[in-house]
């Protein structure tokens, strides 16, 4: 029921090949199982709905990269029971046979990413990251959400040797 987790890589078997040092994910969306569903003698349970992890070949090298969100909490890891994410980063990670390395990440985004997808939103033939971002949540601030997209700055293929 933790909203943040480490990325784990398995090699087609139960054997763990890799576990990230950093935590990723994070979501303020959860559901509770009521006393009625579990009986009066049991403790209420809750579970967070984790964000998806996407895989795409964005750099067109024939290998899929991992596109993953890290929602950041203002309370950090000090208060585990408080899950209030206020900013985010999106990472592009790639497996090199030994571990995951970072190809790129976005700048820090104000608000937390509630969902995201890779899609050609402007019909220019290039994929973008489209994100649903929650800018403010409840409390004294009225909830506000936006949909934004980031263009990839992919390197262009080199010109052939010997001119054009």
At which residue positions do the language-model features occur?
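Beta-propeller-forming repeat regions
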Residues: 1-164
């Amino acid at each position: 029921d933790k909203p943040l987790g480490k990325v784990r890589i398995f090699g087609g078997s139960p054997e763990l090949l890799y576990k990230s040092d950093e935590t990723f994910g994070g979501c303020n969306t959860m559901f509770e199982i009521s006393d009625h569903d579990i009986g009066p003698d049991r403790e209420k349970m809750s579970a967070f709905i984790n964000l998806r992890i996407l895989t795409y070949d964005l750099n067109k090298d024939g290998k899929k990269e991992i596109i993953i969100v890290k929602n950041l909490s203002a309370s950090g890891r000090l208060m585990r029971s408080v899950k209030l994410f206020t900013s985010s980063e999106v990472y592009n990670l790639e497996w090199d046979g030994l571990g995951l390395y970072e190809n790129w990440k976005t700048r820090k985004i104000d608000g937390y990413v509630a969902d995201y997808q890779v899609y050609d939103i402007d019909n220019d033939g290039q994929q973008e990251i489209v994100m649903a971002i929650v800018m403010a949540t409840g409390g004294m601030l009225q909830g506000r959400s936006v949909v934004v997209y980031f263009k990839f700055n992919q390197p262009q293929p080199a010109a052939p040797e010997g001119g054009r």
